[in-house]
């Protein structure tokens, strides 16, 4: 039996200048992201949704600062016996409604996540049964060994089941709509911030919850205005004029450079994601592995890194060694940095059964992410050196997500910035490369490879961290050989910020978190006088 205690909570609590009393007016924090802002935590999948989840709701476990480990959060401890995970809940937690947290809330939250089958519900496919042992104890029984289960719980928001049940909408069965209509516009969490108003296309307004069980930073903002869909030029002007505080992560490099030069601070997160150039392995000429290898070798990785450099010390990316960011379980060592090799590219092309002059490659880029157009241009220039013609196509995100559902509609090349939602390699790789997963924006490669499937399944079943690392290293090597993807760079997410606040998890590596977006938890913000 393994037992994980609450002592690790001290690390997290230590990041906060605890305040159980209402603080003096600490002002308004203004932030933006790409729409839409999905408020229902069971449907959260994108950046804006996740940011709302981490601020409005809490989870059983949470990442530890300066570490890749996990600590109890709403739980005070847990034990593991085979496929059975038992969590003891903290006694002092209350939802924003005033209702106490109980095991029934955890059961409801898991069953709701599974019933809606949306967001990151794929993380809980192996959960066979969730039961309240007593008011403060909840037990999960899995149908099969699943090593990333506890990491997945960082994305299971615990909702106030009593409040939701009082607000069920139309639908079939006992739980009707499971409160979807209500939770799309209201919060039912225990988090440090409560929703005041919500328009998923325009703005979410949140107010601090001074009854939060862990306390907030002494000068945490009283109000957060979270806006959606601001243009880069607008954000630049607003920050420069002192009218905005934190940008989205999608500002073009030159805007970030300009803001930094004008005195804005740059906030960073790294270690959990990457930028991928994904090849449709079902569409000629990319159905030939040697063609894919040729294009991978022809890509100018160093030019890509130069394109995203912001200052002498900050860039949007770091050199990649493979599919997993350097430092993640199973990643390859930094000295194996991927580099352009035109001699190897020509050798691979000579072994390809297709002739480059017979094809025009469709190089897509997402309309809402201007940086991707530059990488499309870089690919076009690189691939032309091998004799490939190409067409650059701008695709709105909504249309792109529709197209990639079917291999025949998927472009030759798709671009994706993504992160491991839980910090675990399974969360990054399974949805991208396992052949059992339907085509989504994560998997426009449409790869089918028995060895890849086998390694992904082994990684899920193996509980020993060292052996899991070996499995994911082998998977990394296999994917480098198959070349379904050009691993452009390991991602470093950069936000521009005003100088009106400090946010240690985004500026001090010793206080950073191993889960994307968690560092933007508003309770860690200290507004300046």
Which sequence ranges carry the predicted segments?
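N-terminal lobe/hinge region of extracytoplasmic solute-binding protein
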Residues: 32-82, 111, 188-189
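Gly/Pro-rich hinge or "lid" segments in bacterial periplasmic/extracellular proteins
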Residues: 64-65, 157-216, 223, 342-343, ...
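Extracytoplasmic/peripheral linker and loop segments enriched in polar/acidic and small residues
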Residues: 37, 391-401, 428-499, 528-529
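Periplasmic-binding protein-like
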Residues: 282, 286-327, 374-375, 479-484
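Structural transition elements
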Residues: 315-352, 367-374
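Long beta-strand-rich cores associated with HINT superfamily self-processing modules
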Residues: 495-529
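Ligand-site clamp/hinge motif
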Residues: 181, 211-257, 389
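Surface-exposed binding/hinge segments that line
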Residues: 79, 122-171
């Amino acid at each position: 039996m393994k037992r994980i205690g609450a002592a690790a909570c001290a690390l997290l609590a230590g990041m906060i200048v605890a305040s159980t009393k209402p603080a003096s007016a600490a002002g308004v924090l203004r932030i933006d992201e790409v729409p839409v802002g999905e408020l229902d935590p069971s449907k959260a999948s994108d950046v804006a949704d996740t940011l709302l989840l981490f601020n409005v709701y809490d989870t059983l476990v949470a990442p530890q600062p300066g570490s890749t480990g996990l600590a109890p959060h709403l739980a005070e401890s847990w034990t593991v016996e085979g496929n059975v995970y038992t969590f003891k809940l903290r006694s002092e937690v209350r939802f924003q409604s005033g209702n106490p947290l109980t095991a029934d809330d955890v059961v409801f939250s898991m069953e709701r996540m599974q019933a809606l089958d949306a967001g990151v519900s794929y993380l809980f496919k192996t959960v066979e049964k969730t039961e309240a042992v007593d008011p403060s104890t909840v037990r999960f029984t899995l149908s099969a060994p699943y090593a990333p289960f506890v990491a997945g719980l960082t994305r299971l928001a615990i909702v106030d089941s009593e409040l939701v049940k009082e607000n069920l909408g139309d639908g079939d069965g006992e739980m009707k709509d499971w409160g979807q209509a209500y939770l799309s516009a209201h919060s039912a969490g225990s988090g440090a911030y409560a929703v005041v108003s919500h328009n998923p296309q325009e703005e979410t307004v949140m107010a601090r919850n001074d009854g939060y069980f862990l306390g907030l930073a002494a000068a945490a903002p009283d109000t957060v205005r979270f806006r959606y869909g601001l243009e880069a030029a607008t954000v630049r002007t607003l920050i420069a004029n002192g009218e905005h505080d934190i940008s989205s992560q999608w500002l073009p490099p030159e805007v970030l450079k300009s803001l930094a030069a004008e005195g804005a601070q740059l906030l960073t997160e790294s270690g959990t994601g990457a930028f991928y150039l994904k090849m449709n392995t079902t569409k000629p000429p990319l159905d030939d592995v040697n063609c894919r290898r040729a294009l991978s070798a022809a890509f100018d990785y160093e030019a890509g890194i130069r394109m995203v450099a912001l200052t002498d010390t900050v860039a949007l990316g770091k050199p990649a060694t493979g599919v997993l960011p350097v430092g993640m379980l199973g990643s390859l060592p930094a000295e194996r940095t991927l580099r352009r090799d035109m001699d190897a590219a020509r050798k691979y092309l000579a072994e390809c059964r297709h002739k480059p002059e017979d094809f025009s490659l469709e190089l897509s880029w997402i309309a809402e992410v201007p940086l991707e157009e530059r990488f499309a241009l870089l690919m076009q220039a690189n691939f032309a050196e091998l004799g490939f013609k190409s067409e650059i196509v701008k695709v709105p995100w909504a249309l792109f997500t529709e197209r990639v559902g079917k291999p025949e509609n998927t472009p030759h090349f798709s671009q994706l910035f993504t992160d491991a939602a839980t910090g675990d390699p399974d969360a990054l790789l399974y949805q991208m490369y396992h052949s059992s997963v339907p085509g989504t924006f994560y998997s426009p490669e449409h790869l089918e490879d028995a060895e890849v499937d086998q390694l992904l399944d082994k990684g899920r079943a193996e509980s020993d961290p060292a052996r899991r690392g070996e499995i994911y290293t082998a998977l990394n090597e296999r994917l480098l050989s198959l070349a379904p993807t050009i691993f452009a760079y390991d991602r470093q997410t950069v936000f521009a910020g005003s100088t009106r606040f400090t946010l240690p998890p985004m500026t001090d590596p010793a206080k950073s978190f191993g889960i994307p977006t968690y560092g933007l938890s508003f309770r860690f913000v200290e507004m300046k006088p």
